Amino acid sequence: MKSKRGSKPPIKSGKVKAKVIYLTRRPPGKTSGGAARLERDTMGEMEVPADAYYGVQTARAVENFPISSLRVPRAMIRALGLIKWAAARVNTELGFLDPKIAKAIRHAAQEVIDGRLDDQFPVDIFQTGSGTSSNMNTNEVIANRAAELLGGKLGSKLVHPNDHVNMGQSSNDVIPSAIHLAALEQIDKALIPALKRLYTALAAKAKEFDPIVKIGRTHLQDATPIRLGQEFSGYARQIELGIQRVERARPSLGELALGGTAVGTGLNTHPEFALRVISLLARETKCPLREARNHFEAQAAQDALVETSGALKTVAVSLMKIANDLRWLGSGPRCGLAEILLPETQPGSSIMPGKVNPVIAESVMMVSVQVIGNDAAITAGGQAGNFELLVMLPVMAHNLLQSIALLARASENFASRCVEGIAADQERCRASIEQSLAMCTALAPEIGYEAAAQIAKEAYKTGKTVREVALTKKILPESRLNHLLDPWRMTEPGLTGGKPGGAGG
């Protein structure tokens, strides 16, 4: 039977119709039991799940932004809770907030800080560019939980999300401040310690492998000898410099926009509010926080996030180089370079029995790619500020905090599951040295570049070593030749031939 014109043909027996999977949580206004409460805001009434601590503005945001499965990172939820906790205390000290309400707000904010209310933050990352939806999500959760603590009902506004929890604040100064605070905390508590562990592991291997001489490589071609420890010392220095780069970004992150409110002028906030809140936050978090020197810059731009992301990208580039080198050095086990032995962590192939792959290094490389991509997004976001406000804050926050978390976990894992367990194949390293045609470099200062090049070419054609060809040609006494071609001497600064000479590329 033919289908009607314009209609889809019936699905044949045995065919499975694809189902669209939406990466969003349950729609607002419904719970597993279907119970809901009715709330009102300036746009009208809307159903909110009866047991939800969030309110109508959060429900609207969930409905408006069914974009992804990405939610505000835990580190930022914690930072928002810290800001609301400190603001309630300062507003009480300034005489603007009833002490009983303030105490309930601080208790609820502490629960947000501790992660006990994380399931009450359903708003998508791809939302309003100022992050207002996430600020109001925080205000509503804290207000409703505080009202509950005071014996009120959810949605009663016994504690008001705007008038009480958001007092003296605007999304435009709270969200940038929360991003800065979250990034600083994660850098100090997670990233720097992880990078230091990786640096320590690489430095220890540099010392352990220092006696082992091997062939160096440039352009993926054989070059003059190098000690394996010297190679690892280069990796350690890359990480050491990466730590310094990240630490240099910390002062910029330490400037908080709090106190600027809507456009940086500080409208509707007490002159001492920001200073007091930030001082309290600095004391609680041990982070180097201070009020922004210029509130207009702090809200209209986010150059500090771009700067920090640039430092993270540089660390990612370093990790990519190191991880890739270790993959190559450990390639084999029989037909590759195989100069080092990487720890075996899991079977590597579903078809080739006994194969073991450098999976930890590959994981690090993928993290590096992601962080580099995140930096591109943050850079583009940083360009999107118009006049008094940058409106890419949630996506910049997501990418920056993800980069910090990924680099921290990858560095820790790289150190513990790979670098700390690396061993060297000394025989393999030693065997490759004599085979290198680049050994003729040490002869060039004494016999000349062209003569040394001829020896290298003949060695290549005949399959002999540079030493064997030089001995056959009797260009130098054997004792002198042995002195010049001593691999260890070639790994230290010095004039092996008695005068300077080029060392190739």
Task: Go through each PLM region and give its residues.
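Conserved, well-structured ligand/cofactor-binding cores
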Residues: 2-505
